[in-house]
């Protein structure tokens, strides 16, 4: 059995950021197309509320917040290469669909839009909303570049689909040299005939992440980092 202690992660401002994947209605709102797939896990973890708590805490101390969204445009539905099972489902049900890359027509209130409760945090002119990822990982958007440009070295990571986009981002971030702390109750997952995706994510994160926190632990450390930064400035 693997019982080696994780190294942990110190939260340092301004080198630490809070990052999310997929904060969309289709995952987090009851009317969302994928909501039924992860509903049980979302409710058990209190995921939607915990995401807002993290956003509020980060904004209160001036921590950088990054969001890696996921959108599909009409040209994405013209792909000819075979899709993965989840991509195939997404295309069939219109998950995260937008009218196009250069228009906001139909976005407001749609499945691709942000939940209203998060908009004060995500549209404040300070949150870094990257270009959309098209698969699961960071390989199809600019989130790595954006993190580098802001001199981010450590990431507190969360999002609604823990065993897919969140974990894919985790793996990429680690291989790009970032330190990562995962927030275990600010995420969720679905099940299939092979087992529980959320539990599978936790198992993998325990092997890979530098730290695995609850939302309460993450908020405590975020607040403590701000106090430490203030003391350093005063000194």
What does each model-found stretch correspond to?
Residues 1-17, 26-27, 60-61, 78, ...:
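Active-site-adjacent betaalpha module
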Residues 14-16, 32-58, 62-69:
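A short alpha/beta connector and helix-capping loop motif
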Residues 21-22:
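N-terminal nucleotide-binding beta1-loop-alpha1 segment
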Residues 68-71, 160-161:
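Short, well-ordered beta-to-alpha junction loops that form the rim of enzyme active sites
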Residues 73-77:
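Short catalytic/ligand-binding loop motif for oxyanion handling, primarily in non-cytosolic enzymes
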């Amino acid at each position: 059995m693997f019982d080696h202690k994780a190294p942990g992660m110190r939260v340092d401002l301004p080198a630490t950021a809070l990052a999310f994947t997929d904060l969309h209605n289709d995952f987090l709102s009851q009317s969302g197309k994928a909501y039924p797939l992860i509903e049980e896990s979302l409710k058990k973890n209190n995921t939607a509320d915990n995401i807002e708590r993290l956003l509020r805490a980060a904004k209160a101390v001036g921590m950088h917040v990054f969001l890696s969204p996921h959108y599909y445009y009409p040209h994405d539905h013209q792909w000819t290469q075979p899709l993965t099972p989840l991509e195939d489902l997404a295309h069939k049900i219109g998950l995260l669909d937008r009218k196009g890359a250069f228009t906001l027509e139909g976005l407001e209130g749609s499945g691709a839009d942000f939940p209203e409760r998060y908009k004060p945090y995500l549209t404040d002119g300070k949150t870094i909303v990257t270009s959309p990822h098209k698969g699961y990982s960071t390989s199809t958007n600019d989130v790595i570049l954006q993190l580098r440009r802001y001199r981010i070295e450590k990431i507190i990571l969360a999002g609604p689909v823990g065993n897919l986009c969140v974990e894919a981002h985790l793996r990429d971030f680690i291989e790009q040299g970032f330190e990562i702390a995962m927030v275990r109750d600010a995420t969720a997952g679905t099940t299939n005939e092979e087992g529980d995706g959320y539990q599978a994510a936790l198992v993998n994160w325990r092997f890979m992440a530098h730290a695995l926190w609850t939302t309460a632990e993450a908020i405590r450390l975020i607040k403590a980092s701000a106090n430490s930064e203030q003391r350093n400035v005063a000194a």
